[in-house]
Amino acid sequence: MLATEKKQEIINNFKKHEGDTGSPEVQIAILTARIVYLTDHFKIHKKDHHSRRGLLKLVGQRRRMLDYLKSRDLDRYKKVIEQLGIRR
């Protein structure tokens, strides 16, 4: 799980205004950090299939959030993809 400090750092990097924790950019960045954490977890715990389902749900959630952002504002979408290094 993400530490509070790490989550706050992500929010500070992607926020649009003061107190912003719910913009698509922030949500996508937090989901990406959780996905990276779980991916590393599975390198050690190969048989943890229960958590693997959670990972797939997170990936789907991030995908939907990216699709939403792409339909609303293509420039913001491209910026987030570039900053996070997500293949697309």
From Swiss-Prot:
| GO cellular component term, pick one | cytosolic small ribosomal subunit
- Pfam families tied to this protein: Ribosomal_S15
Q: Give UniProt keywords alphabetically.
A: Ribonucleoprotein, Ribosomal protein, RNA-binding, rRNA-binding
Q: Name one GO molecular function term.
A: rRNA binding
- Ribosomal protein recorded as keyword: yes
Return the SUPFAM superfamilies for the record. Answer: S15/NS1 RNA-binding domain
Q: Which GO terms describe its biological process?
A: translation
The record, for PROSITE patterns, names: RIBOSOMAL_S15 (PS00362)
Which family is annotated? Belongs to the universal ribosomal protein uS15 family.
Q: How does it assemble?
A: Part of the 30S ribosomal subunit. Forms a bridge to the 50S subunit in the 70S ribosome, contacting the 23S rRNA.
Q: What does this protein do?
A: One of the primary rRNA binding proteins, it binds directly to 16S rRNA where it helps nucleate assembly of the platform of the 30S subunit by binding and bridging several RNA helices of the 16S rRNA.
Q: What is the protein name stated in its UniProt record?
A: Small ribosomal subunit protein uS15
